[in-house]
Amino acid sequence: MDSAGQDINLNSPNKGLLSDSMTDVPVDTGVAARTPAVEGLTEAEEEELRAELTKVEEEIVTLRQVLAAKERHCGELKRRLGLSTLGELKQNLSRSWHDVQVSSAYVKTSEKLGEWNEKVTQSDLYKKTQETLSQAGQKTSAALSTVGSAISRKLGDMRNSATFKSFEDRVGTIKSKVVGDRENGSDNLPSSAGSGDKPLSDPAPF
């Protein structure tokens, strides 16, 4: 093997091959440094894409600045209209809840829950439980009514008993006596005052 005719350029596609009639072609370092993403593009196409990328990035920066200015203007308008942050939050929550309600997932879940509820209410176990609770409620109401009637009847019997009447008579007698003593005491007040004005008799001599 002739070492003079061997291609020693590591970047050459003819590396390791003998060539008597061809000379080494210089390799473009820019092409060698290209990433696989831009392979197959000409230099003009790459420059055009890079220019377009720069333009889009500048437009994004401009749009962000415009958006920030619009947000400040929107906040100023809300402040002048008296729209508080709490009201805006409530409005956003209401809108979000409405969006949830009209969403397909919520509708499907509601339909599924409705089907389960219908199955449960139509099941024999649910009906038996409902009947048992209804009977228990009726029995409780009847028992309370019976107890109330018994208490009322017992109180009536106590009022009609001789002991209760004797107690009422005693209370009435005591009340009449107290009232009479008060009236008699008020009548004796002037006489007591008059006796106070009467001169005392002389003591008997020894």
Curated annotation (Swiss-Prot):
Pfam families cross-referenced by the UniProt entry: TPD52
Spans traversing the lipid bilayer: none
Residue ranges of the region described as Disordered: 1-24, 175-206
Top-level taxonomic group: Eukaryota
Record keywords: Acetylation, Coiled coil, Phosphoprotein
Gene Ontology CC: one annotated term: perinuclear region of cytoplasm
GO biological process, one term: carbohydrate metabolic process
GO molecular function, one term: RNA binding
Chain segments annotated as coiled-coil in the UniProt record: 38-82
Residues bearing PTM Phosphothreonine: 163, 173
Positions carrying N-acetylmethionine: 1
Modified residues (Phosphoserine): 3, 12, 19, 21, 96, 149, 161, 166, 192, 195
Summary of subunit composition and partner proteins: Forms a homodimer or heterodimer with other members of the family. Interacts with MAL2.
Protein family per UniProt: Belongs to the TPD52 family.
Name of the protein this chain belongs to: Tumor protein D54
Species this chain originates from: Homo sapiens (Human)
Origin organism lineage: Eukaryota, Metazoa, Chordata, Craniata, Vertebrata
Gene that produces this protein: TPD52L2
